[in-house]
Design a protein with these regions (language model features):
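Short acidic active-site motifs
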Residues: 4-7, 172-175, 198
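A structured beta-alpha segment of the ubiquitous adenosine-cofactor-binding alpha/beta core
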Residues: 1-13
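Short, well-ordered beta-strand elements within core beta-sheets of diverse protein domains
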Residues: 82-83, 161-171, 186-191
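Short, surface-exposed connector motifs at secondary-structure boundaries
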Residues: 10-17, 74-77, 181-187
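ALDH superfamily catalytic-core signature
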Residues: 25-160
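C-terminal segments
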Residues: 70, 129-146, 186, 193-268
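General beta-strand structural signal in soluble alpha/beta enzymes
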Residues: 1, 19-22, 41-45, 113-114, ...
Length: 268
């Protein structure tokens, strides 16, 4: 009964577009009601941003991007971190430091999921340390890091207070793009690299409507465009308006967006 009014609204055939904010089963159910009524619908679906650190990545810039992408859990929060194997020895440590710092900022421990193929790149004490992790039901004692299957890189971590991220070490930026296109929600992607040509290849090959070179939390209508955001163009059932973008109250157009961030310390 508590949801009857929402079902009635989404099923009203006078609607030109039904926008269901958020994600999860409740949002999917609202979308199903709208679609059954023949209404166009925009659902956020699965979120989670990816950051890829290439061979020319600056460790400090990468760490800043990670830290500022983990201030809170929303759809544009960093979810999956890819580091190329040739830089793993010098990029994994600052990544772990940034993840730890993001947790300390919130007064909690972080949670790390490591692709099975990449376990050897993370210090063993991350896997043996059992720490309180802030969950919805309260603090739960868990290993600070746990392995996951390489097929689970796109799983979105719906964390409460403890920043939760997947780490995978990849052969190349091109391979990371392949994994993104195959496993990610194809939402937000950021490349950390000082190679201009690599950025151009990245933009051409990655199937993401939002592409950047720093922190991922810029993907927001109010923050990036100064416009009231109704929602994000649908990626739950394909792109609603072509390539996707931000739905605002003053425009029905949707374009692919790219940010070139000059200050690596920008955050929200």
């Amino acid at each position: 009964a508590s949801r009857a009014s929402a079902w009635a609204l989404m099923g009203d055939t006078r609607l030109a577009l039904a926008v269901a904010r958020g994600s999860g089963r409740a949002t999917a159910q609202l979308g199903a009601v709208a679609r059954q009524a023949g209404n166009a619908v925009s659902l956020h679906g699965t979120g989670g941003a990816w950051i890829i650190a290439g061979p020319d990545a600056d460790p400090t810039d990468m760490a800043s991007a990670v830290y500022h992408s983990l201030d809170r859990k929303v759809c544009n929060t960093l979810n999956t971190m890819c580091i190329t194997a040739d830089r793993a020895d010098d990029l994994v440590p600052p990544f772990l430091h940034a993840l730890t710092a993001a947790g300390k900022r919130r007064g909690v421990n972080p949670k790390l999921h490591v692709a099975a193929s990449s376990i050897g790149h993370v210090p063993s004490d991350w896997f043996t340390a059992v720490v309180p992790v802030a969950r919805a039901e309260g603090a739960v004692d868990e290993p600070m890091a746990e392995p996951i299957d390489d097929s689970d890189l796109g799983v979105e971590w719906e964390w409460e207070d403890s920043p939760e991220v997947t780490l995978v070490v990849v052969d190349s930026v091109d391979y990371a793009v392949e994994r993104f296109n195959a496993q990610a929600p194809r939402f937000v992607a950021s490349l950390i690299s000082s190679d201009a040509e690599e950025h151009e290849r990245f933009f051409r090959s990655i199937d993401a409507p939002f592409v950047g070179n720093g922190f991922t939390r810029w993907v927001d209508g109010q923050y990036a465009l100064g416009k009231p955001e109704l929602g994000l163009s649908n990626w739950e059932h394909g792109r609603l308006f072509g390539r996707s973008g931000i739905l605002s109250g003053d425009s029905a157009f949707s374009v692919r967006m790219r940010v070139e961030q000059s200050d690596p310390d920008v955050g929200r």
